Amino acid sequence: MGAAGLLGVFLALVAPGVLGISCGSPPPILNGRISYYSTPIAVGTVIRYSCSGTFRLIGEKSLLCITKDKVDGTWDKPAPKCEYFNKYSSCPEPIVPGGYKIRGSTPYRHGDSVTFACKTNFSMNGNKSVWCQANNMWGPTRLPTCVSVFPLECPALPMIHNGHHTSENVGSIAPGLSVTYSCESGYLLVGEKIINCLSSGKWSAVPPTCEEARCKSLGRFPNGKVKEPPILRVGVTANFFCDEGYRLQGPPSSRCVIAGQGVAWTKMPVCEEIFCPSPPPILNGRHIGNSLANVSYGSIVTYTCDPDPEEGVNFILIGESTLRCTVDSQKTGTWSGPAPRCELSTSAVQCPHPQILRGRMVSGQKDRYTYNDTVIFACMFGFTLKGSKQIRCNAQGTWEPSAPVCEKECQAPPNILNGQKEDRHMVRFDPGTSIKYSCNPGYVLVGEESIQCTSEGVWTPPVPQCKVAACEATGRQLLTKPQHQFVRPDVNSSCGEGYKLSGSVYQECQGTIPWFMEIRLCKEITCPPPPVIYNGAHTGSSLEDFPYGTTVTYTCNPGPERGVEFSLIGESTIRCTSNDQERGTWSGPAPLCKLSLLAVQCSHVHIANGYKISGKEAPYFYNDTVTFKCYSGFTLKGSSQIRCKADNTWDPEIPVCEKETCQHVRQSLQELPAGSRVELVNTSCQDGYQLTGHAYQMCQDAENGIWFKKIPLCKVIHCHPPPVIVNGKHTGMMAENFLYGNEVSYECDQGFYLLGEKKLQCRSDSKGHGSWSGPSPQCLRSPPVTRCPNPEVKHGYKLNKTHSAYSHNDIVYVDCNPGFIMNGSRVIRCHTDNTWVPGVPTCIKKAFIGCPPPPKTPNGNHTGGNIARFSPGMSILYSCDQGYLLVGEALLLCTHEGTWSQPAPHCKEVNCSSPADMDGIQKGLEPRKMYQYGAVVTLECEDGYMLEGSPQSQCQSDHQWNPPLAVCRSRSLAPVLCGIAAGLILLTFLIVITLYVISKHRARNYYTDTSQKEAFHLEAREVYSVDPYNPAS
């Protein structure tokens, strides 16, 4: 609740005379609203004003209903007003002499308020708050005043000539107030502008004076003159004029005005030089003179035409050859006339109609082309212009430059797998553009490094490929993946049976940028120990891990007694297999060994003077047990627990309860009364105890009366502390008591070895006293001899000679079997502590690396075209197209190293040529034709020719025909040749027969060999020779 509200409550409670007095409706305001109120409006009611969105409230926003005469109600202050917001409104700093601001700060915008308070010893008249109005004035009331409460006042200030002050027509002035002086127009204030009334009743300074203000003479005006009035008082005007060739820039006159605390001339003009624009250029000509952009007034330029451009063509100047820079009516520089022109004087020159393929003419189309005519070309969509798009008809009747050509733009060059192209983010690929390819580390480029865009819009040669590079190992291997170097991942690896992928090693490979190849490792699959079964055992060892494929066989233990056996339930053999989990698993659950029993049943059991304390009731089956206890006064004789055996009897026999013979009368006695009857119970002690004497227990019964039992007394046997040895210690150093059976172990300090028994035990001697089992050992200094054991590397081998033991600094070189990778150092050394440093390495099985797809060979194929993954051991077979010969191994095998066993073969084109002499050949061969490898031809001769040789031949890999091509011989030589041939055949036959008869005659052995390899067949034919011109022959 505000102060006004509190006042209203106060009036309502304290001044009951105001009850029933009310105020009229609050004054309305434009563009505003009044808070809700109810009628009648009682004294003490507060109403609030607010303005619409774009209006500002000027004045107090709340009014209070009060009464001054206790008769009528009235509002305590006038209503505020709402002014439309003026964003440009700005009020000056408000000053209240004798007061100060308590709220409000600069700048003062429309609607801002300032609240004042008076200084000490001053009181306020007027409203303490004022608002900045749209008219840049403070309102809605005048600024408040602060009146001094001191009795001393300053006297009234005198008037000054040609000036005024803020306290004119005012009497004395209260201390703390100030007076401001100002001069009339044309005068300057000399002295203090503001003087203050002091508390002493005196002014802080003497009143100032107002002196007439005058401007200084303007002096010389560059490139012109100025006309000044005789007296340069405030308000006079000076006029400016420019020399010829200059023009006035700025106002033509300047005025003497007051400026701050002095006087000055208003802005003065300058005389700027008049310039003409650059002389207009002319086609086929030039001008002599100033060629700058701004040419001075009065300058002259002279025009001339260019030299003859070519033979038969010259230029003629038409118009005035000289121009002068002058001014127009607007004082703007201009040339005295238009520029001349140079026109050609040509003979009859005519150029042919220009042509362009895959393009068109976009301008300059004519039926006839003469000297200097130009045409502009553009290409069809998808083609690029090569050359100048504009050509000109010259004086020789030809086009220059020559007509362009339209070439097709290439598509973006393709990306390659495992590589990149250097296209510099180009979006357009014109003919002639070259793109360079490169491969990522670990890959090698196959094909040309660069391709080029041809005018047909295609790339040539074919785009290269990035094939997997062979790793040239540097010998460096990392067990963790490198973070900032290229690693070629292994995605094709697999492990053999009994192994699974587990971890990787990274082999560094040589290259322009060293890179790494991931090698997957195989971990042997192992199973946990096979389950242990009750009443049975398995053939497995006591290993913690069992290798994959291990089989164990279960058997049952022998029967616990005769007639009882254990039967194996389940599979007797289980095998270590693999699953998708981290470890191997057994192929099945372990079997069970269950008892195989006949119908066993023992008789009902009962003892006199006793009772059963545990066990079931009858009937009793195998291994059922019963436990007995005797009644008080009876002693159990026999075993307290019996068991039902397989033979239907109890084991041991059923006990009996016998009446106790000794009824205890008193506590044990150390001395036996004379004449007493004694019964010995036990005269010795258990192991670990020493007999120290006897005691006597008094007994009494009806038959014997009083008698005594002799009872032995036993104490625990102790040993003295074991001996301390030099350069060593034993495990009982911190113990105080050593009982019978306790054991201590000795060990020596570093550099000493133990001589004697390592362990001693507390025992008893012949007299029953405690003693150690032997003498204490000794610690002797160790001789400087080093013996390292023979290092065993599973899946590996030693490169140097093997010994049973190794001495200090002996070095062993080890390596892993093929298919395994080493984890550790290949070189180990025998250390003085009989160990190998840096430790015996291990060999980890490498994963089977899948081979990459085998390379294709031009003009051939292989059998692996539809196979996605090539595992170790897989093979492919290459073959060539018809007419091509396979060069290299046809069969390639994928190795465990992930490479192919041989380089891929290639297909070599093999051709056989036709013979140079083809006379008489009618069919089978064509002149100058090349025949592919394997081709078979069958020859036929023309009439009058005879075939000599085999009619069929085949093209071989050495480019030769096999058998050699036959020839066609003219039949005119046939009779002679046939006769010679017949004679040679007959002569050969006779020689063979003669040699055969001679050899048989000498050997006197005749036999027949039926072997097809050595058999021969002779057939004699009659040869006819026919002369077509002599039928009689």
Swiss-Prot record:
Pfam families: Sushi (PF00084)
Sushi domain: residues covered: 21-84, 89-148, 152-212, 213-273, 274-344, 349-408, 409-468, 469-524, 525-595, 600-659, 660-716, 717-781, 786-845, 849-909, 910-970
Cytoplasmic side: 1000-1033
PROSITE patterns found in the cross-reference section: SUSHI (PS50923)
Membrane topology type: Single-pass type I membrane protein
Sample GO molecular function, one term: transmembrane signaling receptor activity
Keywords: Cell membrane, Complement pathway, Disulfide bond, Glycoprotein, Host cell receptor for virus entry, Host-virus interaction, Immunity, Innate immunity, Membrane, Receptor, Repeat, Signal, Sushi, Systemic lupus erythematosus, Transmembrane, Transmembrane helix
Subcellular location: Cell membrane
Glycosylation sites recorded in the entry for this protein: N121, N127, N294, N372, N492, N623, N682, N800, N823, N861, N911
Cystine crosslinks: C23-C65, C51-C82, C91-C132, C118-C146, C154-C197, C183-C210, C215-C256, C242-C271, C276-C325, C305-C342, C351-C393, C379-C406, C410-C453, C439-C466, C471-C509, C495-C522, C527-C576, C556-C593, C602-C644, C630-C657, C662-C699, C685-C714, C719-C762, C748-C779, C788-C830, C816-C843, C851-C894, C880-C907, C912-C955, C941-C968
Distribution of this protein across tissues and organs: Mature B-lymphocytes, T-lymphocytes, pharyngeal epithelial cells, astrocytes and follicular dendritic cells of the spleen.
CDD domains, per database record: CCP
TM ranges: 972-999
InterPro entries: SEZ6_CSMD_C4BPB_Regulators, Sushi/SCR/CCP_sf, Sushi_SCR_CCP_dom
GO CC terms of this entry: extracellular exosome; extracellular space; membrane; plasma membrane; receptor complex
Residues in the signal sequence: 1-20
The protein, known as: Complement receptor type 2
Organism: Homo sapiens (Human)
